[in-house]
């Protein structure tokens, strides 16, 4: 009658709902937020206190809760205060732990020193951490590597991919394969050594400064009289001193006067390595002025100029023997002597020797702590001199490293000395007063602007090489030319990095810019003639020209890797082809500037770097012509080669190497003519048997030649617009009319294409091996006439778009 109820409700529920699903746990209470984000409030959904909130993270949109939460109430402020207190407590605990570990390491080091008698330097945290990352070091892979020159006599020398020697090797390899000739027959490898005929017969070597030669006391150097020495030393102050301001003129004059004290009128001065190396540099420079006015004695003038270098080289060797004994206790004067030794080697194109000697010179500068902030109490004029010396070494280091494609020796992270200045106070401290009549510059402004330019270009090239290593890491390819996508990625990256160089151009003082005739601008590639200011001081004219030549020279080495042999379709690499043409424009700018200046003035007469700039510009122009025999900029490039040969003829009377260089350019240009003639004949040759355009053979003939694939437009249309620019000279008038007729009445590309797959319709990329094995492809005249114009609609570049590339600085 009475029912029994169990007090255990959970057991009763479990027995009653044994087969039912268990009751789910209650949903946790959501965290309260002071203010929801804008998106959650707009959609009236629950928000959280994350930054950004979870809803915005899930949808991938912007969240307004990105700023740190501000305390809007007293409890929130108390929570924020408590959080900060806890954070401070944690940081204090970390500091205490670090101090204890440092004391333990110091105690252990003291015990080791007490037991062994030798101190062990403590390892930094970075080094300690590096041992744990040894697996990463063992797994590192090399990136883009250079190519050793063929026929190397001294073993394998490394020339990086940014060097001109690497580019010469690429040109030589391409010529050898395209012309079916061995490498030794291309005559271009002789230029890698920068022409041996130009250097002295006895090159400087370590034996010149060996202890045996010093103990023997043999010195074949013929001393000069004081008037003769002063004649050559006077050339220093208007030439090299304005470019490399590393000597205090008043201090040097007092020092030079002391060398002649207590000597007889017919006697010789006291030994001085600084004076000897300055005489070597000035005699090499002054020998270029010792030419005859008779044009019939050009060969004799060249030999006379070459023989005039020998006395200067004898002074250089004697300076090296004297400097060898000063290495243990160097001084600023010893450092100055080494710097001008590098300049001398650079001027006679012994670049490897100069680069090796630069390493010794930098160690001397480190020993004298020139790379650090000057000590307190150092006179201001001494501080400024030390800064000028150090940053001159920086310029030489980067110029040689970029030329040879090798890593820089100076690490900017270890340098704490400031940049030199060019204000009136700095002019007073330098001890040299050269009036220019311009308020915005001084004679030191060139040095400062060169440092800033090299710093900007070095950053661009370092970032570019790092990007190359990242893309090539893990890839079997050894260079960037196998994958068009990689090349285009690098071109896009380089274009972004060039912003620093463009900013430098905008900030160059107006008085250091070379004026142009017409509407031309300085540091541009618009090919406008210079408006030379012959009334300015000679040193200022030279500084303006050298600054712009250095700018174009550095950009040539930056853009040069994008010249490809043979090029691929430009529809895949429009940015890379833009850099290709920019490199050519800078090369032609150097040629035009040097030809005008050497023809109209004597400002750069005898200036050795000008010859080296011209040679690198010639290599770039030759490479472009060989890689792109038929394209809009090629006629201008070929004219620029003729201008460059005339420039070499102008300096041939005082640079014997220029005569050899002109002959090499003529020979290689003839080979380029043969390639162009072969291609031109393939365009005009009518084949006896016509194959169907839709057959496999016909499809192969419709493929464009490799030289024309290089410059196709990235933006492709269904029909070709009216051509407003002239076509290459290989096209006949009748062919031109047919092409224009076809462009006026275009045929839809879908009606012209065979019914094949899209892969078969796109023009295949012509690799280097394929182009060399098959030779230059034979294209019938129907391709130009319009009967086989399929590939032109797929990849031909609109000629009007070339202005976008040629006007880029």
Curated annotation (Swiss-Prot):
Residues 37-63 bind DNA. Residues 1-28, 118-146, 199-225, 683-710 are annotated as: Disordered. Transmembrane segments: none annotated. Keywords: Coiled coil, DNA-binding, Metal-binding, Nucleus, Transcription, Transcription regulation, Zinc. Patulin was originally used as an antibiotic and specifically trialed to be used against the common cold, but it is no longer used for that purpose since it has been shown to induce immunological, neurological and gastrointestinal effects. Genotoxic effects of patulin with dose-dependent increase in DNA strand breaks in brain, liver and kidneys have been detected in mice. However, more recently, it has been proposed that patulin might also have anti-tumor properties. Residues 71-107 form a coiled coil. GO terms for molecular function: DNA-binding transcription factor activity, RNA polymerase II-specific; RNA polymerase II cis-regulatory region sequence-specific DNA binding; zinc ion binding. GO terms for cellular component: nucleus. GO terms for biological process: DNA-templated transcription; positive regulation of patulin biosynthetic process; positive regulation of transcription from RNA polymerase II promoter by galactose. Residues 118-142, 207-216 have a biased composition (Polar residues). PROSITE patterns: ZN2_CY6_FUNGAL_1, ZN2_CY6_FUNGAL_2. InterPro entries: Fungal_SecMet_Regulators (IPR051127), Transcription_factor_dom_fun (IPR007219), Zn2-C6_fun-type_DNA-bd_sf (IPR036864), Zn2Cys6_DnaBD (IPR001138). Pfam families: Fungal_trans, Zn_clus. It is found in: Nucleus. Transcription factor that regulates the expression of the gene cluster that mediates the biosynthesis of patulin, an acetate-derived tetraketide mycotoxin produced by several fungal species that shows antimicrobial properties against several bacteria. This is Patulin cluster transcription factor patL. It comes from Aspergillus clavatus (strain ATCC 1007 / CBS 513.65 / DSM 816 / NCTC 3887 / NRRL 1 / QM 1276 / 107).
């Amino acid at each position: 009658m009475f029912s029994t109820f169990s007090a255990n409700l959970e057991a009763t529920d479990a027995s009653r709902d044994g087969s039912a699903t268990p009751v789910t746990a209650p949903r946790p209470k959501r965290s309260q937020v002071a203010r929801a984000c804008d998106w959650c409030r707009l959609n009236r959904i629950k928000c959280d206190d994350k930054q950004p909130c979870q809803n915005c993270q899930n949808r991938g949109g912007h969240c307004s809760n990105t700023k740190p939460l501000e305390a809007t109430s007293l409890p929130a402020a108390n929570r924020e205060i408590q959080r900060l207190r806890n954070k401070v407590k944690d940081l204090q605990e970390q500091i205490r732990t670090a101090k204890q570990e440092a004391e333990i390491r110091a105690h252990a080091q003291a015990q080791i020193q007490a037991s062994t008698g030798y101190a062990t330097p403590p390892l930094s945290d970075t080094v300690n951490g590096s041992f744990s990352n040894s697996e990463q070091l063992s797994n590192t892979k090399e990136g883009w590597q250079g190519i050793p020159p063929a026929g190397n006599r001294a073993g394998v020398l490394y020339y990086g991919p940014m060097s001109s020697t690497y580019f010469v090797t690429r040109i030589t390899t391409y010529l050898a394969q395209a012309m079916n000739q061995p490498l030794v027959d291309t005559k271009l490898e002789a230029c890698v050594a920068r022409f041996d005929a130009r250097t002295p017969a006895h090159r400087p070597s370590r034996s010149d400064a060996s202890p045996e030669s010093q103990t023997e006391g043999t010195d074949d150097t013929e001393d000069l009289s004081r008037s003769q020495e002063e004649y050559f030393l006077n050339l220093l102050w208007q030439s090299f001193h304005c470019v490399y301001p590393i000597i205090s003129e008043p201090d040097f004059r007092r020092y030079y006067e002391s060398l002649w004290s207590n000597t007889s009128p017919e006697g010789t001065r006291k030994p001085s390595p600084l004076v000897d190396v300055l005489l070597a540099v000035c005699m090499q420079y002054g020998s270029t002025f010792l030419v005859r006015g008779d044009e019939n004695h050009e060969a004799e003038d060249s030999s006379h100029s070459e023989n005039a270098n020998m006395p200067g080289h004898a002074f250089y060797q004697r300076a090296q023997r004297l400097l060898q004994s000063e290495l243990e206790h160097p001084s600023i004067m010893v450092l100055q002597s080494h710097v001008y030794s590098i300049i001398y080697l650079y001027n006679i194109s012994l670049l490897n020797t100069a680069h090796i000697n630069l390493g010794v010179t930098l160690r001397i500068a480190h020993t004298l702590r020139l790379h650090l902030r000057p000590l307190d109490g150092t006179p201001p004029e001494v501080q400024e001199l030390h800064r000028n010396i150090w940053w001159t070494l920086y310029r030489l280091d980067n110029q040689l490293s970029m030329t040879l494609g090798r890593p820089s020796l100076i690490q900017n992270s270890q340098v704490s000395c400031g940049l030199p200045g060019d204000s009136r106070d700095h002019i007073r401290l330098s001890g040299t007063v050269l009036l220019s009549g311009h308020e915005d510059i001084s004679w030191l402004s060139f040095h400062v602007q060169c440092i800033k330019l090299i710093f900007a270009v070095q950053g661009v090239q370092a970032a570019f090489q790092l990007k190359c290593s990242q893309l090539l890491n893990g890839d079997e390819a050894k260079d960037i030319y196998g994958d068009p996508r990689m090349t285009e990625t690098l071109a896009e990256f380089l274009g972004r990095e060039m912003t620093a160089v463009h900013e430098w151009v905008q900030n160059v003082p107006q008085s250091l810019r070379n004026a142009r005739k017409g509407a031309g601008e300085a540091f541009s590639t618009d090919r406008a003639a210079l408006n030379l200011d012959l009334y300015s001081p000679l040193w200022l004219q030279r500084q303006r020209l050298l600054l712009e030549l250095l700018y174009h020279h550095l950009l040539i080495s930056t853009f040069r890797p994008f010249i490809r042999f043979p090029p691929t379709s430009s529809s895949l690499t429009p940015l890379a082809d833009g850099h290709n043409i920019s490199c050519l424009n800078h090369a032609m700018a150097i040629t035009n500037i040097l030809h005008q200046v050497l023809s109209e003035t004597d400002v750069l007469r005898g200036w050795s770097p000008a010859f080296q700039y011209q040679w690198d510009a010639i290599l770039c122009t030759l490479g472009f012509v060989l890689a792109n025999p038929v394209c809009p900029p090629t006629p201008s490039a070929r004219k620029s080669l003729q201008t460059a040969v005339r420039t070499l003829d102008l300096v041939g009377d005082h640079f014997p190497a220029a005569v050899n260089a002109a002959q090499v350019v003529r020979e290689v240009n003839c080979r380029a003519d043969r390639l162009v003639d072969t291609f031109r004949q393939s365009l005009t040759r009518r084949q006896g048997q016509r194959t169907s355009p839709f057959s496999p053979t016909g499809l192969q003939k419709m493929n464009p030649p490799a030289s024309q694939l290089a410059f196709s437009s990235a933006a492709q249309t269904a029909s070709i617009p009216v051509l407003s620019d002239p076509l290459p000279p290989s096209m006949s008038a009748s062919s031109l009319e047919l092409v224009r007729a076809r462009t006026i009445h275009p045929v839809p590309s879908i009606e012209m294409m065979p019914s094949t797959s899209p892969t078969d319709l796109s023009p295949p990329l012509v690799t280097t091996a394929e182009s060399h094995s098959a030779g230059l492809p034979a294209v019938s005249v129907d391709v130009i006439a319009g009967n086989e114009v399929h590939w032109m609609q797929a990849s031909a570049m609109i000629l009007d778009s070339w202005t976008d590339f040629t006007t880029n600085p």
